């Protein structure tokens, strides 16, 4: 590796001190960089692996400038920072990711319109600004469809499935609280995602196609490589996206595959993503390694080698309650506990990756463990 752009000992600032920030910091440190993190939570996971911690809200202009003055480059671990605040920071400090992607992707309507104009295949959608617009959604999309808030929402929050007329009132309640987008509900055969890193010189590195399973709108499991031949098609869609949206660093595009085997772009995460965590053990570079290489101006690997097929399981609070006593009996479970102070049933507390020669058998073993049947 050649680190002739940002020298050893330089400081990387991270806005956001959750598990993604923590894993970014760990990659940065093994490459010889120092890390400063800003987060409002006194006990955020990244604090305990950073060289310097600034406790402040994400819209605290003074604290953000303090971070900028201390750091040679700034990155962010999530997309809920104010795009306008980020734009102002970009004018003064080195933030390779920029603010444009955040500005587009914070608004689901703008995201979908941008994806559509880029020529990607997206699920049919319509803007619903007020409750009377729901009639137009029924006429345009037909049942079933999903109503989602334009702003905010993650892990399934801020959305309502409308199966029939009986569900309309729940959708109207959501529309009355905020502007929304309605989109056609697909009969989904499989969910996949593609994690990508783009460097300053427009170099692009692709990770293997990831096959995902969600439960209650939270990622439950990722299998790599995906058990469906869609990698070329997914790359083609990503290549269209990066012509329209500025990305530097690691990002992930999530896709639906419907019952007719059609691939649709669902949404984009403009930073490292939960479905890419397997790469820490299963690939020669992790998604965090390539992210740090990109934002520090280094060359990216030409390709990512999958060292071994893998099954990655999210660990929610309820999973820790179920499995905590078994961890020491399974050294093949590569365990990552994020260090969050409060355990909650549906909160992401960690993840684990199992390298395997038989993903189907390992998948069944994990189902048995996580569903408490073995």
UniProtKB/Swiss-Prot annotation:
Pfam families in UniProt: ATP-grasp, PurK_C, RS_preATP-grasp-like
Keywords (A to Z) from UniProt: ATP-binding, Ligase, Nucleotide-binding, Purine biosynthesis
EC class (word): ligase
Any single biological process term in GO: 'de novo' IMP biosynthetic process
Reactions accelerated catalytically: 5-amino-1-(5-phospho-beta-D-ribosyl)imidazole + hydrogencarbonate + ATP = 5-carboxyamino-1-(5-phospho-D-ribosyl)imidazole + ADP + phosphate + 2 H(+)
Residues annotated for ATP binding in this entry: 108, 148, 153-159, 183-186, 191, 214, 266-267
Pathway linked to the protein: Purine metabolism; IMP biosynthesis via de novo pathway; 5-amino-1-(5-phospho-D-ribosyl)imidazole-4-carboxylate from 5-amino-1-(5-phospho-D-ribosyl)imidazole (N5-CAIR route): step 1/2
InterPro entries named among the record's database cross-references: ATP-grasp, ATP-grasp_carboxylate-amine, ATP_grasp_subdomain_1, PreATP-grasp_dom_sf, PurK, PurK_C, PurT/PurK_preATP-grasp, Rudment_hybrid_motif
GO-annotated molecular function: 5-(carboxyamino)imidazole ribonucleotide synthase activity; ATP binding; metal ion binding; phosphoribosylaminoimidazole carboxylase activity
Boundaries of every ATP-grasp domain copy: 112-296
GO CC list: cytosol
EC identifiers of the protein: 6.3.4.18
Entry keyword Ligase: yes
Subunit structure: Homodimer.
Functional summary from the UniProt entry: Catalyzes the ATP-dependent conversion of 5-aminoimidazole ribonucleotide (AIR) and HCO(3)(-) to N5-carboxyaminoimidazole ribonucleotide (N5-CAIR).
Family: Belongs to the PurK/PurT family.
Name of the protein this chain belongs to: N5-carboxyaminoimidazole ribonucleotide synthase
Taxonomic source organism: Staphylococcus aureus (strain MRSA252)
Gene of this entry: purK
């Amino acid at each position: 590796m050649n680190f002739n752009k940002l020298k050893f000992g330089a400081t990387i600032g991270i806005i956001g001190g959750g598990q993604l920030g923590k894993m970014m910091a760990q990659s940065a440190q093994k490459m010889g960089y120092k890390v400063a993190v800003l987060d409002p939570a006194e006990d955020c996971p990244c604090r305990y692996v950073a060289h310097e911690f600034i406790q402040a809200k994400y819209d605290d202009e003074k604290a953000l400038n303090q971070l900028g003055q201390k750091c040679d480059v700034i990155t962010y671990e999530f997309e809920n920072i104010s795009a306008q605040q980020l734009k102002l920071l970009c004018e003064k400090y080195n933030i390779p990711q920029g603010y444009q992607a955040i500005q587009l992707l914070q608004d689901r309507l703008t995201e979908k319109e941008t994806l559509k104009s880029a020529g990607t295949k997206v699920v049919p959608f319509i803007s619903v600004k007020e409750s009377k617009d729901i009639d137009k959604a029924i006429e345009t999309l037909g049942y079933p469809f999903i109503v989602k808030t334009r702003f905010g929402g993650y892990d399934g929050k801020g959305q309502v499935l409308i199966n029939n007329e009986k569900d309309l009132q729940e959708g109207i309640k959501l529309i009355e609280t905020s502007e929304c987008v309605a989109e056609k509900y697909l009969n989904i055969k499989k969910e996949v995602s593609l994690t990508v890193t783009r460097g300053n010189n427009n170099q692009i590195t692709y990770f293997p196609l990831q096959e995902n399973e969600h439960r209650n709108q939270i990622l439950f499991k990722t299998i790599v490589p995906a058990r469906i031949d869609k990698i070329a098609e997914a790359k083609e869609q990503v290549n269209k996206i990066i012509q329209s949206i500025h990305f530097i660093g690691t990002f992930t595009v999530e896709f639906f595959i419907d019952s007719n085997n059609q691939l649709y772009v669902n949404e984009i995460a403009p930073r490292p993503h939960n479905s890419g965590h397997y790469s820490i053990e299963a690939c020669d570079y992790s998604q965090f390694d390539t992210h740090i290489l990109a934002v520090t101006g280094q060359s990216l690997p030409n390709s990512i080698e999958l060292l071994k097929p893998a099954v990655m399981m999210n660990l929610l609070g309820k999973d820790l309650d179920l499995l905590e006593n078994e961890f020491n009996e399974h050294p093949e479970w590569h365990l990552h506990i994020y260090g969050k102070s409060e355990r909650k049933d549906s909160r992401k507390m960690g993840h684990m990756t199992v390298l395997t020669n038989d993903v189907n058998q390992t998948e069944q073993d994990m189902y048995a463990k996580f569903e408490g049947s073995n």
